[in-house]
């Protein structure tokens, strides 16, 4: 149990409704490793010299942390102690949350306090519709702008099963692992499918160091996401 801004949060934290847009990219593994070096974790090398970065936009609609927007830069990493590589290694990999701007103070405090997520306050401009888009800016500087083209619907039988995956974070010198569960519905996928523009914020320069913007491997959207988050565990 945690108390955030005078509100009691019982674990696991529940997200009952959210929608998601995601873009997956192949990036230079050494550049990705340099970006997360302080964490002590190792990027998952899916091919020689290549790693995977996933950029996500979430609109949390109904959950214990309230209603808010969130952008995240996630680097896929091996579990601590693992040296697996190749595409099959992604099955056990977790998402290291490197950037995580949000637009509400409560989720910012909860994220940083409970899980060590690097949440910072940001401004979002959201363009709903068949071709979904958003901009995220911090202190008046654009981080990234993304425009998604709709994908092909995927039957819920393939996506609605609850999945459990770890996420990792590094904040104030501490690396943490958090186990979470997720179930998706209303999912669409497509190859490519996103147009992105980087701004002049330091986060944007980090994304540029990975070779972005470039064509995405795959993009997806989910009309509804249900999630739970356990307490974090310090691992380094």
Name these PLM-found stretches.
Residues 34-39, 48, 67-69, 87, ...:
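Generic alpha-helix signal with a bias toward terminal, lower-confidence helices
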Residues 20-23, 37-43, 87-91, 97-103, ...:
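Generic detector of short, locally flexible boundary/turn motifs and exposed helical patches
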Residues 17, 49-52, 60, 88-90, ...:
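Alpha-helical protein-protein interaction elements
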Residues 29, 51-55, 68-69, 73, ...:
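Aromatic-enriched hydrophobic runs in primary sequence
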Residues 1-64, 68, 80, 203, ...:
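N-terminal domain-onset segments
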Residues 1, 11, 22-24, 35, ...:
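Detector for methionine-enriched segments
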Residues 58-143:
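Aromatic- and glycine-enriched beta-alpha-beta binding-site module
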Residues 1-6, 105-236:
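Interaction-surface and assembly-scaffold signal
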């Amino acid at each position: 149990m945690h108390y955030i801004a005078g509100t009691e949060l019982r674990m696991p934290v529940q997200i009952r409704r959210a929608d998601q847009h995601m873009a997956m990219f192949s990036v230079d593994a050494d550049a990705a490793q340099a970006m997360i070096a302080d964490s002590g974790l190792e990027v998952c090398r899916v091919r020689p010299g290549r790693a995977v970065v996933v950029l996500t936009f979430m609109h949390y609609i109904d959950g214990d942390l309230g209603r808010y927007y969130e952008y995240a830069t996630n680097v896929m990493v091996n579990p601590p102690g693992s040296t697996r590589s190749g595409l099959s290694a992604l099955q056990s990999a977790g998402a290291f949350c490197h950037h995580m701007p949000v637009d509400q103070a409560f989720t910012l405090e909860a994220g940083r306090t409970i899980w060590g997520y690097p949440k910072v306050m940001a401004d979002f401009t959201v363009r709903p519709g068949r071709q979904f888009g958003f901009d995220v800016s911090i202190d008046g500087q654009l981080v990234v702008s993304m425009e998604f083209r709709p994908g092909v619907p995927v039957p819920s039988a393939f996506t609605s099963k609850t999945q459990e995956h770890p996420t990792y974070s590094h904040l104030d010198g501490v690396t943490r692992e958090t186990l979470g569960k997720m179930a998706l519905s209303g999912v669409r996928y497509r190859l490519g499918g996103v147009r992105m523009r980087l701004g002049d914020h330091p986060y944007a320069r980090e994304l540029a160091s990975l070779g972005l913007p470039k064509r995405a491997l795959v993009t997806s959207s989910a009309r509804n996401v249900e999630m739970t988050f356990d307490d974090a565990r310090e691992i380094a």
